[in-house]
Amino acid sequence: VGFIFHSFNLMPYYTALENVAFPLSFRGVPYDKRMRLAKKALKDVGLESHMNHMPGQMSGGQQQRVGIARALVTDPDIIFADEPTGNLDSKTSDDVMRSMCETVKSHGKTFIMVTHDPNMAAYADKVINILDGRITDIYYNKHENGGGIE
């Protein structure tokens, strides 16, 4: 299982590469392989040129893409995201969501997202509305942005 946080949760004293490689250390992946996999994950989200940047040197959208790469690097079958664009402006949110959709499709992953933003829900193939803890509506999205996100 991969997880993309609302507030990025990047380690401020680690580079983008180190942030992405970090979860692999808990799995006992050797250092060289961790770095190779982290570089590939950053390339997959369009941040190959930012791998040595610290979080404070990157925009919010770039930091969120580091978070996406970190979620993908362990090759999970399912990725959960909690308001993944909540801290971003609308243009950056759209850019990040397009990147996420492309990445999810190219890796064949299931992506489940929680959002209060109907613009972000428009990227989903399936939407489940919940009010006061109860499902109020379920529908399949026909919007052009639909991209394999539930």
Predicted regions and their residues:
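ABC family nucleotide-binding domain
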Residues: 1-123, 129-130
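Conserved beta-strand-loop-alpha-helix hinge in the C-terminal portion
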Residues: 126, 134-150
